[in-house]
Amino acid sequence: MKILIFGLTGFGKTTFAKQLTADTDIPHFNADEIRGMFKDWDFSSTGRIRQVTRMIDLCTIANKTCVVDFVCPYNLYRKDYDITVWMNTIESGRFEDTNKIFEKPTHVDYEIKDYNYDKIIKEIQNRLQ
C-alpha cells in the first residue's frame, strides 16, 4: 500500500508522516531527503515530474506499505497512491512558484485542516493492520 502525504511547503507533511510511521517498520520517504540523496534540486516542471516518478518508484522498489511526503502539486500523479492525505493547514506555502502550480485535489481520502490529527493517524494505522 502506498500512502501519499501531500500539500504545500510548511503545511506539516513530514511531521504527520513521522507520527504515522513511528514505532513501525513502514518506510517513510521524505522528498527533501530524496532530492538530497540524488543531488537534484531542480524545481522546473521537468524536475518536479522526475521527483514524482522517483517517489512512486521508491514505493514500488520497497515492495511493501510505505509513506511518502512531498508537495506532489499535480492531481494526475496523486492517483498512483492507495491512500492520500492532503495537508491543508495554512493559506499558502513559502514558495510563490509552487503556490501557483499547486492543483487543489479533486479527491482525497483525508483532508487535514489543523494539527489535531491523532484520530486520523489512528484510523490510517488501523487500515494498515
Where are these regions (language model features)?
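NTP-dependent small-molecule kinase module
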Residues: I3, Q19, D23, I83, ...
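ATP-dependent NMP and nucleoside kinases share a basic, alpha-helical "lid"
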Residues: C59-D109
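Residue-level preference for the first positions of well-ordered beta-strands
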Residues: K2-L4, P27, T65-V67
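Residues at the C-termini of beta-strands that transition into short coil/loop
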Residues: D32, M87-N88, K113-N116
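Walker A/P-loop
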Residues: T14
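The conserved Walker
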Residues: L8-T9
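Conserved substrate/cofactor phosphate-moiety recognition/catalytic segment
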Residues: A17-T60
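Amphipathic alpha-helical transducer elements in NTP-driven molecular machines
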Residues: R48-I56, R78, P105, D109, ...
